[in-house]
Amino acid sequence: MSNAISTSVAVIEEVKKADFTFDPSIRRDHAEKYRTSEWYDGRGEIRAVEDGRSFQISATFTLESEVRLVDRVFDPSNPVLAEIYKTRGRCVAVVDQTVNELYGESLRDYFKQNEIPLEALVCRAWESDKTPDTVHKILAFLGKDGCDVSRNEPVLIIGGGVLSDVAGLACSLQHRRTPYVMIGSSIVAAIDAGPSPRTCTNGNLFKNGIGAYHPPVLTIVDRTLFRTLPKGHIRNGMAEIIKMAVTDDPILFELMEKYGQRLVDTHFANIDADEELEKVADEVIYRALYSYMKHEGTNMFETYQDRPHAYGHTWSPRFEPVAKLMHGHAVGVGMAFGATLALEMGWINEAERNRIVALCTSIGLSVYHPIIEDTDLMLKGQKNIRRKRGSSGLWAPLPTGIGSCGFAGEVPPDLLISAVEEHKRFCASLPGEGKGEEMYLSDLGLE
């Protein structure tokens, strides 16, 4: 037995010497015909260690994503969707229930006139529907017992922020990565949740706690879809524009100061608007998208936490579901409190804090809610978001002026408490003590 073992070891050593050539860096190129999807690419490198017992692997993943402003996307003469789906022989779509009620006939007519079969799942997408069960429902539709989508077949998603999150997450899970095209029917979906790579569903009392990074291959922004949005939803979406104005674009901030309320009243220049306001609406959308994507698109997998677009989203993920606030109002409270905190830290002056709060209140967004007085809740929120951001710091985006920001690595409990007290004192002098219009989910029938 001993001789047999010795012989085997000797043979192995000879094979190693004869056949194994140590190469410190091995890469493989793949022929284009083997590529899984036209939107995704990847390369890798393997480095073998001379001891013959370990390897080091590094890999890169490349994706292509586009954001496009389009007018009247469901007009049968508009080629955008037809060019995507005609050659594929069908369109598989997940459509928000309300969108289906408003635009379902136009959607079906579009594909009928362009001679493209349409297979659609109509899905209710309230905040209360942002659950793993909804994701599973969409997966059943996309999977083998449903439409059996291909790994290179872009699913069409049409809806607001909730649907973009849950349907996008379903696409990330189907075949481990199925592409999708996003048409945002709300302002939140059009300029924030839609083009975002963060697909998700809610966790237990923590908003967006479960998810994956999977951006759409194309985001279509059609301002004419905002015509049918209730004003409460228009206002809700404005918070995502204001956050970029405060942290990144002073011109956008001034446009919002001057035209913000008119954009709410005219449903983003779709009703009783003149040509000037239409141009302003397009400029506001473009600037908000550009500010958002120049930070999001260059940090697509959130590998760094210097993210201005997280302004207003440090404490709100914890208190929003507890207070049952509309997302935009929770962000409004978060932004206004963040401005007061920045004032307390000496990052901005009082006039700048007041301008930020005044912009929010001018369009009816909330800037204060008693929920932030719950110190335990706020500190738990900090703990949760710190873990979510990698535990190296809190990295809360806070304004350093109008159109610029810095990132607070830590907010000690005593500073948090004093900032809340100062913010409460300041907001007590505001109309309604800082409460916004239609600030709760129940106000818009979403509960």
Task: Name every feature range the model reports, one short phrase each.
Residues V264-L377:
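Active-site segments that bind and position negatively charged phosphate/pyrophosphate groups
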Residues V94, E119-L121, L156, V181-I183, ...:
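Hydrophobic/aromatic beta-strand patches that form the interior of the parallel beta-sheet core
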Residues L169-D265:
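A glycine/threonine-rich phosphate-anchoring loop and its flanking beta-alpha core
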